[in-house]
């Protein structure tokens, strides 16, 4: 049996799974997340959960009701959740400089590294790029 690949999920993939305005992306994201649930291989961070709540309740068309958004956050909090702290912030700022990234993208990458994952699902970074031992995969590419 192949070893499961633990995967860090960025906000845009989580949000796409719950955003009805783009059915193609929603289907792809839901399939990816379903597989991670089945394999118990998903990891997330407090940053992702916070951003999801803000996006879902403010940018979805129509916005997700706050109570439902809290339910989704609580559901994904069952996954391993990387807590963002000062050491992670500092490591991300160094990664930001080394790889010419936005601070927020560097913070996602550092959270993925801290969790020990080697795969990051995101549409914000270059598909196929590898940074700090983490392979970037855009499921919508």
Regions found by a protein language model. Give the residues of each.
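Acidic, PIN/NYN-like endoribonuclease modules and their adjacent C-terminal/linker elements
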Residues: 1-6, 109-141
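Short, well-structured N-terminal submotif of metal-dependent ribonuclease cores
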Residues: 1-44, 59-67, 71
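Alpha-helix C-capping/helix-to-loop hinge sites
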Residues: 17, 35-39, 55-59, 75-80, ...
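Acidic catalytic patch
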Residues: 46-50, 70-98
